[in-house]
Amino acid sequence: MRWPPWGSESQQADTPSPSTEQQAQQPPTAPAARPSRPNKDWNQSVNAFDWAAFTELRTIIPTAILTTAILGIVHIHRRYLRRFPDAVSIAPSYFRQRSILGQVTSVGDGDNFRLFHTPGGRLAGWGWLPWKKVPTSKKELRDKTVHVRLAGIDAPELAHFGRPAQPFAREAHQWLTAYLMTRRVRAYVHRQDQYQRVVASVYVRRALDFPPFRRRDVSYEMLRRGLATVYEAKAGAEFGGPGMERKYRRAEWWAKFRGLGLWKGFRRNKEWESPREFKTRMGLEDQTQGRENKS
């Protein structure tokens, strides 16, 4: 039967149909090429970004608050919470301006000791936070303490460097050890000396003193008990001001008048020496012995 009905048989016979072999011989159609990406200019990319969002108040205000908070934390840490491991590391801006707070770890002589700097004190967690404990062993404290020289006084010398002990040196050392050991003190630093110590006016609060917990000047307490003399060196004397020097000399005069401590019997004893005179005599003897050894 013809299909469509109006078509002739001759037309259908004249129209060839592609055979299977011809279809196999036809080359495959190539895939369509992808459209190339247009080259974007960097300036166009930057300009296309919406920078206006960074100028809105909802962005500026939180950014300013966060930046101010970070800078404030850094400033507070550098000014109030930075720990000084030794006297050399104390910033010069502290001298005659600020103080350091710490716990006394050892007393070397009648007028000097070592403290472990605890910036911020108990408010910063020292003494009650697990990671802010003051070390107790000598190994842990090595190179971690500030060597402090009491300002304005000179105590009798203990035996060291081959020199004998000065009279009343042991009593002064024992009193200072009992008065300061393991206690928290505040030291108003004045300067560094030639022995890598800081000369400081030191204050302590004690419950057993009367009135209790009143701030005590350690140098003044030693002078009024006759445990030290006013510092008499020609250079390097530090008192914390002319008013403190007058206060110290008045305390020394009263101790001398009452014959307390090292002033006991000093008027009748012709061989009595002050700590400064003792150091001067020992220095001259060392020089004489040195010349004799060379000759």
UniProtKB/Swiss-Prot annotation:
PROSITE patterns: TNASE_3. Residues 15-36 have a biased composition (Low complexity). Its main location: mitochondrion. Its EC number is 3.1.-.-. It holds the Pfam family SNase. Residues 98-265 form the TNase-like domain. The keyword Nuclease applies. The active site is at residues 149, 157, 197. InterPro entries: SNase_OB-fold_sf, Staphylococal_nuclease_OB-fold. Ca(2+) binds at residue 154. The chain crosses the membrane at residues 60-76. It is a single-pass membrane protein. The keyword Mitochondrion applies. Residues 1-41 are annotated as: Disordered. SUPFAM superfamilies: Staphylococcal nuclease. Keywords: Calcium, Endonuclease, Hydrolase, Membrane, Metal-binding, Mitochondrion, Nuclease, Transmembrane, Transmembrane helix. It is found in: Mitochondrion; Membrane. One of its GO terms (cellular component) is mitochondrion. GO terms for molecular function: endonuclease activity; metal ion binding. Signal peptide: none annotated. It is an enzyme of class 3 (hydrolase). PANTHER family: EBNA2 BINDING PROTEIN P100 (PTHR12302), SERINE_THREONINE-PROTEIN KINASE 31 (PTHR12302:SF3). Belongs to the LCL3 family. This is Probable endonuclease lcl3.
